[in-house]
Amino acid sequence: MKRTLFVIIAIVTAGACLAASPEQSKQFISPVYTIDKIYHSMEGPSSVERVYLGDPAAPAEVLWVTGIRTEMVDADGATPQLPELMCHVNVDLDPARHQALFGFRRATAARLMTLSQGMLTAKVPAGFGFPLASNEPLLLFTQVLNLNIQKPQNLKVRHRVTIDYIRARDLTSPIKPLFNVGASGMVQLDDNPLAMAHSMASMPVPAMASVTTDAGHDSTSMSSAASCLIGARAPQATSTSADYVDPQGRKMTGHWIVPPGKQVNHSDISWFMNLQFDTKLHYAAVHLHPFARSLEMRDMTSGKTVFLAKAENPPNAIGLLHVDEFTSAEGVPLLHAHKYSLISTYDNPTTTNADSMASVFLGLDDPELVVPNSDQLAHASATLFDANTLVLHTNIGTITAAFDREHAADTVIQVSRFVLAGAFDATRLIGQKNASIAVTPPMVRTSSLLQPTRLESGVERKPGTVSYCRPGGARMEATILIDMDQPKDPDSTCIGFARIVKGLDLLAAIQPGTSASIVNAETVLRPDAAPKVVAAK
């Protein structure tokens, strides 16, 4: 069932990030949830909605996300409800879109910010923020729980979520960019009686509601919104109950049992964080379950505590009254050569087993980001996500191809990223012996632009199909192939992403051993350039 998320915009005149920079807030009201019984963590009614901080139809501009908060309200959207009914709120990026828009070399984590029971507000230090394009889709996941009310009698409740941000155009001095990194405490799954086979695969159906982004990505690429875990489940563990597979090949889970009494769990998160450079920690949010006492992030190399978050439990009920967050304008150094661990402490006072998790969501200094201005961001957004045509300007004439974003969304973004960076400029169309024409941009131009792409069906390989071939195996460099005949043995590393609509006769003149020069390439939006494209079988 499609749900509607109501949006309210509020302007806060006194900026929290910079005194002279007014902070804006956008409010989202979740669907009405009915609480009719006891719901433990991740079991209650939930929804996933796509939201925007700006107008998705307008040219993109740079925003800085500075905070998030949620309030539990009645069905009317205004009357306060019990905070203890809050399970969690996740705000997730579309990682491929975000990475391409801002030109990141590193992989981008999906989870931007999160809230959970005991932590209903999160705010980065003044002068810091997470960069976001105004037309980027966010996935807003909200969920409720009920740990204490035995007869709730169909209690109606909603989340009222507020996201705070600053428009870059309103800044009077630069803001310091943060990037998001997450990590989870884990236990080994195999032969471990305390491990819980409780992952996304076993979540209630409502929490996995199908969502499709404007970039064409479906819920499989952004399904982390419906989980407190970090990132996607390990692909090696798709058919198992594992959430992750560590570098030693061990199946790990981020959910485990806390038996009666005290339990301390140590987890190496170095491989999880995968820091590529030295940085500083300025912000951390923590996700814990009832009976948690604390969560510590420790530098195992130096033996020093990075931060310690304490949790407060209610005296006569189950839940979390308060969980510390961490903020620091000065920052705590995190070194890529050091090892880091999460140490969770639980104390279960009951006579039965309890479930547990321990996750952190970090905001780190971003030394790599070159902040685009609004014109640059709008151009990048149009090139990467709006254009439907690839245009090659050559010495023999103009060649155009129609993109197929339906069957090759990630591949089109990858190729468009090359175009945006000028990787195809002053290259050559070279005739091949296998009745195809190849374009191979220099590796020095493409190596920093490569991003992981999921396996896509792509366009059927036949004369006129344009394919992207990933580097690997015998092919050392990223290559564009144009089929001039039916390929006899199609390369499985090549994904068709477009069809030639103009210039096929020009290409036919390029025989094996001959070539033509590409002056430059561009992507454009043409209303008449969308022929019917057949997906690969």
Predicted regions and their residues:
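Beta-strand-centric surfaces of beta-sandwich/beta-rich domains
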Residues: A20-A378
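Generic detector of short alpha-helix boundary/capping microenvironments
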Residues: V7-I8, P56, F272, F385, ...
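Bacterial N-terminal signal peptides
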Residues: V7-A16
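Cyclophilin-like peptidyl-prolyl cis-trans isomerases
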Residues: V371-K537
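Positively charged n-region of N-terminal signal peptides that target proteins for export
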Residues: M1-T4
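Generic low-complexity, intrinsically disordered sequence content enriched
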Residues: I9, G182, A508-Q511
